[in-house]
Amino acid sequence: MQIGVFRKKESGKAYKLIADTGVTIKRQAGFSMTYQWKGCLIEHHKRVLDVHNPFLHTYLHSFFEENYCQELVLDGKVVNILSPLLTHLSVNTHILKHMLAFGIGIRQLCDTASVYRHYYGEVDGAELEKIYHKMGIYRWIQVLNALLVGYLGMPADFLPFPLSGNEDAEWMIEDVLQVGNFGFYDKRFGSKSMNTGTRRQNAIGSLFHHFKMNVCYAPAEACWFPLMQACSHVSNFLKFR
């Protein structure tokens, strides 16, 4: 289960609340944390958008504050969830992050397809296109959308904006079928028996391979991703050694 606590003050309170229960908390790259709660693995994320380009953070922060959430009533209680626009951005940037690391599986593609179907007609497609262009990942999103339509059979009408018709998704679907869920089945970088748990054999080889594949479609993210991951590793080491 993944939980997002996105404002700095709130994320600090959430960490203290969990730590006070006595559960073992593991820090992850990307300023996230994981722990086991009643037999369920929980991931806490501090960022609503997995965007690693630091020059976009001011723009994204102001955008986030303006478009943060909408209210949903569950069992008579009002809870806040991400707005439809932010849900699109959050899911797709999260998938891109994993694609830049060790790859993704069919499950992650279904996440995007589900969002498109659920929020069909509720998002301004032109505004979403503008944001993707600003983030420098528009071409990558077009490949992702082409894959959903061309290989998974999702009706093109559910897309938030039209396909460009210029992007070939064959390279992406081939990688999805090769690596499996989060890259644990990629025999190019270690056998299945080697890639178990949360550790992968020859992780550097996999990272470099996915960098080369994606850099033409999301250049800034592909370049900043390994740098920011390394920074978060160092930060966690210095804070919690």
Q: Where do the model's predicted regions map?
A:
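RNA/tRNA-interacting regions in translation and RNA-turnover enzymes
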Residues: 1
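Conserved NTP-donor binding/palm subdomain of two-metal-ion nucleotidyltransferases/polymerases, i.e.
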Residues: 5-241
